[in-house]
């Protein structure tokens, strides 16, 4: 009798925001990076991708992927690499145990939803590919560890490998040509430093002009600064950042985070022709963070920017009133602040020009903090 059952599994996966940046591939096909990187996984209460993976012999249209209600192309090499790798691991289980249903031979139907704007510099591809890989791994009942699964997610989107873990996560660049040692590992769980918070200023929810993939390869090919960055700057920053996290040393964490962001965007500007992901609002956000730190007399906030204009500001819970209060005051009427922000009292006031640049350019804020890795859920998307 043929198996007509529909098998399914769902997971949520988080966004991660790098504090030591990934920029540049040494192998574009396998998504192998030119340097290691390190990120903070953000709470799924605020930013998450929900993905349901199902398979059945009755799915006659072949594999499919629906993202935010729209059919998405799955013919790309990256998605295909993830499917192929996961199927082969399931097939190995089926070969070892003939009583298992032959799920590896059934078409896959993936349905995914983000609760944040896609492709606007909010690391949506990282959460998306991490969720896709984890959902299929749950569906196939694979015994692989998050680090093993990160090898697969990496082939979909480099930074996705870091979204297989919660907390503070390193992506080790590895040295092997086949990429078998280029994977994520846990630097520290969220519970090690749970006080870490992030305020995201969404400067533009529009799709970015130069995609990360093409941008980074232009940098590799044309930037003179790039070699210095991958040879000296990043290895030093990785060591300092791991130390800062281990010691819960926020001033050190903050300085490395800001210097790293500056270094990354300097190599983008040094690309020929230059790439500019940041805009006037981004630069105003930097001035705002500098203003806060200067007026407080210690480093209480750190800015970082990925390949887009959105500013992510890291701070510790104990300084929430200072940071949230200052931005709440400047961004009156902008949505996304959490309950209690209105009562946050900050002694910091930005000058009128800075405040009005921020108010005009920031479309919303997202208030969040460090969080956990993918979570299996009983919430299913059709």
From Swiss-Prot:
One of its GO terms (molecular function) is ATP binding. Its EC number is 4.1.1.33. Keywords: ATP-binding, Lipid biosynthesis, Lipid metabolism, Lyase, Nucleotide-binding, Steroid biosynthesis, Steroid metabolism, Sterol biosynthesis, Sterol metabolism. Induction: Expression is regulated by the Zn(2)-C6 fungal-type transcription factor FgSR which binds directly to the promoter. Pathway: Isoprenoid biosynthesis; isopentenyl diphosphate biosynthesis via mevalonate pathway; isopentenyl diphosphate from (R)-mevalonate: step 3/3. GO terms for biological process: isopentenyl diphosphate biosynthetic process, mevalonate pathway; sterol biosynthetic process. (R)-5-diphosphomevalonate binds at residues 22-25, 78, 157-162, 213. GO terms for cellular component: cytosol. Belongs to the diphosphomevalonate decarboxylase family. Diphosphomevalonate decarboxylase; part of the second module of ergosterol biosynthesis pathway that includes the middle steps of the pathway. MVD1 converts diphosphomevalonate into isopentenyl diphosphate. The second module is carried out in the vacuole and involves the formation of farnesyl diphosphate, which is also an important intermediate in the biosynthesis of ubiquinone, dolichol, heme and prenylated proteins. Activity by the mevalonate kinase ERG12 (FG05912) first converts mevalonate into 5-phosphomevalonate. This is Diphosphomevalonate decarboxylase ERG19. It comes from Gibberella zeae (strain ATCC MYA-4620 / CBS 123657 / FGSC 9075 / NRRL 31084 / PH-1) (Wheat head blight fungus).
